[in-house]
Amino acid sequence: MFETLVEVFLGMTAGQLIKLIPSTLFQELAVETKVDAQVKKLSGEVMFKLIVFSMLNSNKLSLRVMETFLQSAQFKSFSGYDILESRYNSIRDRICTINAEYFEKLFASIFAIYNKELNEEKALTKTDSTYIALAAKLFSTGMENGDNNKRFVKYSVNLKGSIPSSVKVFTQQRYISEDVALSEVINENEGLKGNTVVFDRGIQSRKSFENFTDSGKWFITRSKLDIRCKTATKKEITNKPAGSTVTIISDEIGKLISGRAVVTNHDYRVIKATIDSSGEPICFVTNMLDEDVYLIASWYKQRWEIEVFFKFIKQHLNANFLVSRDENGIKVMVYMTMILSILIIAYKKINNIKGYKIAKLRFELELDSELIKEIVILCGGDPSKAAHLFSSA
């Protein structure tokens, strides 16, 4: 259904990695989205570079931090713009009013570049959601979720291979249901056609299963143990491979029956197993009727990679802190978080770095070295004479 990926990377500096993004992309999308219409100072490209630079160089991002960086020599060198003067309130207003579609399209374009660079075009997709909590007195339009003093912003992500391929931000109460939120994220992602997506028990709606199958999207999920299935075929269980962490008990194909006794049009596969380490029973549901049963179980196990991704962006990219409480501003910052995560994850994989913390630190240091080299050249010097100072090996 999709290829097992073989990672063979020769290494790449942070500067080389960023240069994979065409310099013309910013202007092309600016024209397409009209992001710079009637704007003199804080163009879409400047805002993109300011947010990336500020996220990399600050442990807790704020508008004041961004204002300080905007006026710094380091950022002027990084962005290629010499004169940049704006107050924090101008930055705030720009984030709140800038066309978020510009950043959405940048995210989609940048994903496509690095998805190909990482050889992950046919990789498995994992889908899940996470929340950001805000004080109710500061953000009244978010979701309620059991705490009257807080409101929540939810964003749902498709993680294709190791990097995010799409994201949606939700603030309306009906999206508290994963059946609604995750189903929408999967249904709207045309790139999932002919590919496989894995998600947890958040989606149980038979209608969602039918929609995925109708649109040619393969899925694997976990279900309740008492799922109702009108069994038509009992498949023979294949030999358990070495390294498997579950033992398959049954493997059946049939039509699912909803709580209202509605029978699905398509056949689905219900796989029951036990987790070897705990003896806990587990049930999988999929519309992949022919794949090896233990292979399906191993693919479902990869779902945990998106939990690791959420932990990474919250711990190292400050995804829990919102610079803007305006819905448009929140979308801009979420798209930018996704873009920066792509850069760091790609850098980590290409250079075979184990931890996210060290990958982010080395990425930052290499960009600093690039800035120093540019300053040396501007002053008439030759950075190659001190090449040993710029080595991150």
Positions of the model-derived regions?
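Short coil turns linking two alpha-helices in DNA-binding domains
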Residues: 84-87
